[in-house]
Amino acid sequence: MAPTTKGAKGKTSAKGESKNNKVLGSKVSKKNVKRPPPKEVKSKARTEQSQLKKTKKREYSEAELDLPKLNMITPVGVVNPKGKKKGKTFCDDPEAMMTIFAMVNAEKEGQIESKIMKARQLEEIREAKRKEAEARQSEKKNKLENAKESIRQSRKHKGGASSAKSNKAETESPKPKSGGKKKSVAFA
């Protein structure tokens, strides 16, 4: 409801309000509103001088950037001039470069020497194992030869003393004197 005035005290007039409502709620048609004509914006050709000029970007110094120094090969005392082409020479002092080179070479030679030492040790171990195996084989052969000789000697002693008694004893009692298993040796 609309606020009431002092003179009207509770009475409202329908005519006055309807006029006010008409003015407030009236629509403005968009067809009748005049707009200014659109302005044409011409783009400049890329070959124009103003387009060809490159804006110079600001170059920051290393101190301003405050970047951490990572992946650097250069020694502590050497500072590479900025903008210099990267190459194999990184040091003005050849003595410092040679000392670094010598240190790296010594490290690599140490690794190679350790590999050679390991190879020698392994070869010595293999040689010792080979000698042990040969010694075992020769020991077995000697043992076998001794057994052969003892058997031959026992046969000679039995045959030379009394051949008749031994033949008779072998036919009568084929069992060996010891109660255990009979040992048999076959030679190829």
Curated annotation (Swiss-Prot):
<keyword id="KW-0509">mRNA transport</keyword>
<feature type="region of interest" description="Disordered">
    <location>
        <begin position="127"/>
        <end position="188"/>
    </location>
</feature>
<feature type="compositionally biased region" description="Basic and acidic residues">
    <location>
        <begin position="127"/>
        <end position="152"/>
    </location>
</feature>
<feature type="region of interest" description="Disordered">
    <location>
        <begin position="1"/>
        <end position="68"/>
    </location>
</feature>
<dbReference type="GO" id="GO:0005730">
    <property type="term" value="C:nucleolus"/>
</dbReference>
<dbReference type="GO" id="GO:0051028">
    <property type="term" value="P:mRNA transport"/>
</dbReference>
<comment type="similarity">
    <text>Belongs to the LOC1 family.</text>
</comment>
<keyword id="KW-0813">Transport</keyword>
<feature type="coiled-coil region">
    <location>
        <begin position="107"/>
        <end position="159"/>
    </location>
</feature>
<feature type="compositionally biased region" description="Low complexity">
    <location>
        <begin position="1"/>
        <end position="13"/>
    </location>
</feature>
<feature type="compositionally biased region" description="Basic and acidic residues">
    <location>
        <begin position="37"/>
        <end position="47"/>
    </location>
</feature>
<dbReference type="GO" id="GO:0042273">
    <property type="term" value="P:ribosomal large subunit biogenesis"/>
</dbReference>
<dbReference type="GO" id="GO:0008298">
    <property type="term" value="P:intracellular mRNA localization"/>
</dbReference>
<dbReference type="GO" id="GO:0003729">
    <property type="term" value="F:mRNA binding"/>
</dbReference>
<keyword id="KW-0690">Ribosome biogenesis</keyword>
<dbReference type="GO" id="GO:0030687">
    <property type="term" value="C:preribosome, large subunit precursor"/>
</dbReference>
<feature type="compositionally biased region" description="Basic residues">
    <location>
        <begin position="178"/>
        <end position="188"/>
    </location>
</feature>
<dbReference type="InterPro" id="IPR037650">
    <property type="entry name" value="Loc1"/>
</dbReference>
<keyword id="KW-0175">Coiled coil</keyword>
<comment type="subunit">
    <text>Component of the 66S pre-ribosomal particle.</text>
</comment>
<comment type="function">
    <text>Required for efficient assembly and nuclear export of the 60S ribosomal subunit.</text>
</comment>
<keyword id="KW-0539">Nucleus</keyword>
<protein>
    <recommendedName>
        <fullName>60S ribosomal subunit assembly/export protein loc1</fullName>
    </recommendedName>
</protein>
